[in-house]
């Protein structure tokens, strides 16, 4: 089991361009974390909606995408290939993320990234689908398997500006529909 940080601000990740992303710099802002994949059926929808949310709250929201290949091998690009895959394949059309993508990682199992160990400890299941599980056991490629595991690509975690993990959303919950919760956390009029 991965070490579980005491505070969200103790965590960090490495961006696709190799820079350390220190979560301590996010104080006072809401943070949306989503495990992403460039070859999933909802890649275009979710990446486009992540850009929309980042553009709507440019100074008060941090969006972080964590590429992961644990679900149907749908992020089989190397770190240095991910941006080109997004730009030319899916979503394509010159797409460029307006948010930070970090290096590929595992979100479940023995080698899960510390960010996901922390988030799954604080938010053990999606609020919109508390019974969500991986639907096909043949696709489970990690061990150990836990009830709190991320079930598929594009699960989302929203952390409030006061550092409290606020809510976890299933893969079927449209990313853009998180906006009212972001406004609530940021105390912006709806």
From Swiss-Prot:
SUPFAM superfamilies: Thioredoxin-like (SSF52833). The keyword NADP does not apply. Exclusively expressed in the stomach and small intestine. It catalyses: 2 glutathione + H2O2 = glutathione disulfide + 2 H2O; a hydroperoxy polyunsaturated fatty acid + 2 glutathione = a hydroxy polyunsaturated fatty acid + glutathione disulfide + H2O; tert-butyl hydroperoxide + 2 glutathione = tert-butanol + glutathione disulfide + H2O; cumene hydroperoxide + 2 glutathione = 2-phenylpropan-2-ol + glutathione disulfide + H2O. It is found in: Cytoplasm, Cytosol. Keywords: Cytoplasm, Oxidoreductase, Peroxidase, Selenocysteine. InterPro entries: Glutathione_peroxidase, GPX_AS, GPX_CS, Thioredoxin-like_sf. GO terms for cellular component: cytosol. Disulfide bonds: none annotated. Catalyzes the reduction of hydroperoxides in a glutathione-dependent manner thus regulating cellular redox homeostasis. Can reduce small soluble hydroperoxides such as H2O2, cumene hydroperoxide and tert-butyl hydroperoxide, as well as several fatty acid-derived hydroperoxides. Cannot reduce phosphatidycholine hydroperoxide. This is Glutathione peroxidase 2. It comes from Macaca fuscata fuscata (Japanese macaque). The lineage of its organism: Eukaryota, Metazoa, Chordata, Craniata, Vertebrata.
């Amino acid at each position: 089991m991965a070490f579980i940080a005491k505070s969200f601000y103790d965590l960090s990740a490495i961006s696709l361009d190799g820079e350390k992303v220190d979560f301590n710099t996010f104080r006072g802002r809401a943070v949306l974390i989503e495990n992403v994949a460039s070859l999933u059926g909802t890649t275009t929808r979710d990446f486009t909606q992540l850009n929309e949310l980042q553009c709507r709250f440019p100074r008060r929201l941090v969006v972080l995408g964590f590429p992961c290949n644990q679900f149907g091998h749908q992020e089989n690009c190397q770190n240095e290939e991910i941006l080109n895959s997004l730009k030319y394949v899916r979503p394509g059309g010159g797409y460029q993320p307006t948010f930070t993508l970090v290096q590929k990682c595992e979100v479940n199992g023995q080698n899960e990234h510390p960010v996901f160990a922390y988030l799954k400890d604080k938010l053990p299941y999606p609020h919109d689908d508390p019974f969500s599980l991986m639907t096909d056991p043949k696709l489970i490629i990690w061990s150990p398997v836990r009830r709190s595991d991320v079930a598929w690509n594009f699960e989302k975690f929203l952390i409030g500006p006061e550092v409290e993990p606020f809510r976890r959303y299933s893969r079927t919950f449209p990313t853009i529909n998180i906006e009212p919760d972001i406004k609530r956390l940021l105390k912006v009029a709806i």
